[in-house]
A protein has these predicted regions:
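Long, contiguous domain-sized segments
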Residues: 2-232
Length: 232
């Protein structure tokens, strides 16, 4: 919800000008996903509330993204953690036939199949994915970047992978989208888009300060820190 408020603030600001780019730390729309424990602990009413809330958030996000695109703003989602998404194995662009595995595992299997040391970045995509519960369609690219100029034996620690996505009806040229991402990463000497890394670091500091202040005001012990961090 906070992210939605920030997107609305950006929409109404002087920064949302034609030719500008908005990078979202995460997907353009949230996947229709229920935590594993919900099937055992949540009531039917609570599940419906969660589902309705998720659909509302997605519809509001898409409205904002549509308005930004009409203003000439490029809106791109960057997903850094691929262990909970399964788009690659569902579409299977490399014809690996490995069953349902997460995106990170799929990329690893692809590198093992080609049996080649990753010496330079490569791209998987674009992949067209329709949302589970709506008519929203996204285009996705997976960027795989080696960590070292001279990699050691192939392994997950030798490369960084992340997903770039945008709405299919985006009017920007697809090569222009990737150019923006590459400029903010490779051209700045970073494996991931530098803008997101800077913001992520600032957010963690702000969150840490909020937790410290909460513990100070409530008089909670340090042992309670973990619990309240998870709540925040």
């Amino acid at each position: 919800m906070i992210e939605l408020c920030l997107m609305k603030t950006f929409l109404n600001s002087n920064y949302a000008t034609p030719g500008s780019t908005l990078l979202i730390d995460g997907p353009i729309t949230y996947p229709f996903y229920f935590p594993a424990e919900t099937s055992l602990t949540w009531s039917r009413d609570k599940l419906k509330t969660y589902s309705d809330s998720l659909e509302f958030l997605n519809s509001e996000r898409v409205k904002i993204v549509d308005r930004l695109m009409k203003q000439g703003v490029l809106v791109v989602g960057i997903v850094k953690r691929l262990v909970k998404s399964y788009y690659l194995s569902s579409v299977d662009p490399a014809k690996l036939s490995v069953g349902r595995i997460n995106d990170e595992a799929y990329i690893m299997m692809l590198l093992l199949r080609v049996n080649k040391t990753l010496e330079k970045p490569f791209i998987i995509g674009p992949i067209r994915v329709k949302h589970e519960t709506s008519n929203i369609t996204r285009l996705m690219w997976y960027i795989v970047v080696p960590r070292r100029i001279y990699p050691i034996t192939s392994g997950m620690g030798n490369f960084v992978s992340y997903r770039v996505e945008l709405l299919e009806n985006n009017s920007h040229r697809k090569d222009y989208v990737l150019e923006q991402i590459f400029y903010d990463s490779f051209h700045t000497g970073s494996l991931l888009p530098l803008s997101l890394l800077v913001v992520d670091r600032r957010v963690k500091k702000i969150t840490s300060s909020m937790v410290t202040y909460l513990l100070y005001m409530t008089g909670l012990t340090e042992e309670s820190t973990g619990q309240y961090i998870s709540v925040l």
